[in-house]
């Protein structure tokens, strides 16, 4: 599997033999959005990633452009791993409740590292040696 990070689009591009999987970092708050999964796309240095599929240039705009539409943005943006309690009314992947009973979680991208080969797991069986791996 090939893994690339395209800095200009802030996009992760993962390719298998027949499929492509793309996710992008969006806005100043570093939301992680699902861009594409499907038939393999051809990547070239001159072709930008299809981040237009996220439709962040349309209403509801990203919070840095129009914070009044934050809830609408959170409810419609295709989060890669959606949280709960902050405006996204779809099914969440993670739910958090504090000791005081408050709910809400908003995960944000901080950094990543792409390693050349999947590390061995001591004491555990391991499959597919030699594959690239991404830590986000």
Predicted regions mapped to residue ranges:
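Acidic-aromatic substrate-binding/catalytic surfaces of carbohydrate-active enzymes
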Residues: 9-127
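Short, Gly/Pro- and small/polar-rich lid/capping loops
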Residues: 1-10
């Amino acid at each position: 599997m090939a893994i690339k990070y395209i800095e200009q689009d802030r996009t992760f591009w993962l390719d298998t033999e027949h499929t492509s999987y793309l996710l992008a970092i969006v806005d100043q708050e570093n939301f992680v959005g699902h861009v594409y999964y499907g038939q393999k796309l051809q990547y070239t240095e001159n072709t930008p990633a299809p981040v237009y599929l996220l439709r962040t240039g349309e209403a509801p705009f990203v919070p840095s452009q129009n914070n009044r539409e934050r809830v609408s943005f959170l409810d419609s943006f295709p989060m890669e791993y959606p949280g709960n309690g902050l405006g996204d009314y779809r099914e969440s992947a993670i739910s958090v409740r504090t000791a005081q009973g408050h709910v809400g979680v908003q995960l944000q991208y901080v950094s990543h590292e792409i390693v050349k080969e999947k590390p061995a797991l001591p004491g555990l069986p391991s499959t597919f040696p030699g594959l690239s791996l991404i830590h986000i």
